[in-house]
Each structure stands twice: as structure tokens, then as C-alpha cells.
């Protein structure tokens, strides 16, 4: 008559967080963190079923934001600060998708790295 009792782990409630959006030429990666930088939820366009060139579309970024914010809302996240980086075309649609999720946005910060004559860029495509 040995019975094991399962104890359900209580999720932390985090009301203030940071959203890191990395929009590259090939993919979009979204990470929700708390103020200390501990990851709450993350998602990417490739992980949401988009493959190849479709990962770099604005629609894929929108779906990625929706999935990641669903996970983050389970922790009680209400107020966010946005840090967006990268040269991708999906930056604008990712921001619009975040505004549609009913979060209180305190700040928007562009953290794109700017090369001061760093590595040589890839050659131009000849189609």
C-alpha cells in the first residue's frame, strides 16, 4: 500500500520582463526574460514549423511572437521592455504583434550591432 503523492510545482509570477527579439536575415528568435535575464519563454520561426526562406518572413515573426507570449502569460507577465536587434525585415511586424498582445510596453530599445569595419560582407548575388 505504498502510494506516491505527486506535488505540483508552483510557477513563479513575474509581472515585469524584457522581450529580446533577434531578427536576422534567415530567422526570428524571441526570448522573454525577467529583469535579471533568466529565460521565461522563447520561440523561433524555425521551431514553429517554418522552414527555409519562409522563416525570414514577417508572418513567421508574428506567429513566433504569439507563441512565445502565450507561454510568458502563463507566468503572469504584464509589463515588458522591448530590446530588438538584427537587420531582418521582420522587425516591424514583430513589434506590431507584441502591441496586439495587450502588454504594457515601457520602453523600446534597438540593440543592433553596428560594425566599425569588421568582417568582410558576403559577395553580391548574381541571379
Swiss-Prot record:
GO biological process, one term: translation
Keyword presence, rRNA-binding: yes
Organism field: Rickettsia africae (strain ESF-5)
Disulfide bonds: none
Family indicated by similarity: Belongs to the universal ribosomal protein uS11 family.
Name the record gives this protein: Small ribosomal subunit protein uS11
Assembly behavior: Part of the 30S ribosomal subunit. Interacts with proteins S7 and S18. Binds to IF-3.
Keyword terms: Ribonucleoprotein, Ribosomal protein, RNA-binding, rRNA-binding
GO (cellular component) term, any one: ribonucleoprotein complex
MF-aspect GO terms: rRNA binding; structural constituent of ribosome
Described purpose of this protein according to its UniProt entry: Located on the platform of the 30S subunit, it bridges several disparate RNA helices of the 16S rRNA. Forms part of the Shine-Dalgarno cleft in the 70S ribosome.
InterPro entries attached to this UniProt entry: Ribosomal_uS11, Ribosomal_uS11_bac-type, Ribosomal_uS11_CS, Ribosomal_uS11_sf
Gene3D superfamilies: Ribosomal protein S11 (3.30.420.80)
Keyword RNA-binding in annotation: yes
Amino acid at each position: 500500500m505504498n502510494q506516491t503523492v505527486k506535488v505540483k510545482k508552483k510557477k513563479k509570477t513575474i509581472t515585469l520582463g524584457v522581450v529580446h527579439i533577434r531578427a536576422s536575415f534567415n530567422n526570428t528568435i524571441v526570448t522573454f526574460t525577467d529583469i535579471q535575464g533568466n529565460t521565461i519563454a522563447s520561440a523561433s520561426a524555425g521551431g514553429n514549423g517554418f522552414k527555409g526562406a519562409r522563416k525570414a518572413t514577417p508572418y513567421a515573426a508574428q506567429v513566433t511572437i504569439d507563441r512565445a507570449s502565450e507561454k510568458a502569460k502563463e507566468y503572469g507577465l504584464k509589463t515588458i521592455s522591448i530590446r530588438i536587434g538584427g537587420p531582418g525585415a521582420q522587425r516591424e511586424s514583430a513589434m506590431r504583434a507584441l502591441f496586439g498582445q495587450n502588454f504594457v510596453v515601457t520602453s523600446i530599445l534597438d540593440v543592433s550591432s553596428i560594425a566599425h569595419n569588421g568582417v568582410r560582407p558576403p559577395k553580391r548575388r548574381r541571379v
